[in-house]
Amino acid sequence: MTWWRWWLAFAAALPLQAACNLLNTWGDERSGVDDVPGAIRTTPQVHEGCVSMRAVLAAAIGCVVVSGLLAVPLFAVPAHDGGFAFNWPLLVISLVGLFGACNYATGVKFKYRGLGVPFVFFLMGTIEMAGVVCASCLEALGGLAWLAILLVSLPVNCLVAVIMHGNDMRDIPSDRAAGIRTVASVLGPRGALLLYYALHLLPYAMVACCFRLFVMCRLAFLPQALWALLPLAAFPLTIRTLHTATRVYCACPENPPWRGLERASGGIHFVFGLLYALALALM
């Protein structure tokens, strides 16, 4: 693994993420989601005409181009004969990421077909992690390496998906009025809250299972394996967020005015992710 490739992959991923967000804004505006009375407009500048739709689309395309240019050096990996080989796995992962960015709220519109949360679960967790590993490692990955990427990414998958789910929980009334199917609008307030609980709590269960596995299989000495429990330090933040979401639901079960859940979940994702990355590095 070479660190300059890791940082370059990180730099290339940022504009692609920005492109996905811009296309999401562009798609929402075209679909009329923000025209529904009572809808919470996360980008009122576009809806009010301060920023044109053409400018949003141009910015999204520009971000994709910048991401592609930054990623060009990553497609070449040193070969055994002293030359360079093409990084085909990275190309496949990059195309999957580009397809996802272009079809979340536009094109196929996975977001409006009740597939937004599972789509984000894998695309912004497993796929992103696999892309960074493929870009950073100079040797071919075996089957066990791909399995490890999948398993290690699962806690991150849950926490990135719950940010989107919290956003959808807030928008249940306006999404239903606009005829949009999201996981939250299909499940209803009670089912959406249960899923919110599951996505928040599963990462901690996975961390505990990981620690148990390390100890049972003696994959690491006990003092070293204890680092696996480091992400549990974020648990009080999760309890506070779940308590807030439950309190709002109990006050008005039919139409709970959930506000700020995505912001709180984003904070948990940041703290947990930082501790999780540190734990993996120390182990």
Model feature map: region roles:
Residues M1-A11, L69-L90, E128-L154, A205-W227, ...:
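Helix-coil boundary and interhelical linker segments in multi-pass alpha-helical membrane proteins
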Residues M1-W26, P89-C102, L144-G166:
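Membrane-embedded alpha-helical segments that form the functional core of polytopic membrane enzymes
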Residues P15-I40, A161-A184:
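Acidic (Asp/Glu-rich) catalytic motifs at the cytosolic membrane interface
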Residues V36-G82, I180-Q224, R263-F272:
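Multi-pass membrane catalytic core of lipid/isoprenoid biosynthesis enzymes
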Residues P44-L141:
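Intramembrane alpha-helical segments
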Residues P118-V133, S185-P189, R263-Y276:
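Small-residue-rich segments of transmembrane alpha-helices in multi-pass membrane proteins
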Residues V120-I172, A178, R190-L193:
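Functional transmembrane core segments of multi-pass inner-membrane proteins
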Residues R212-M283:
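Extended hydrophobic alpha-helices typical of membrane-associated regions
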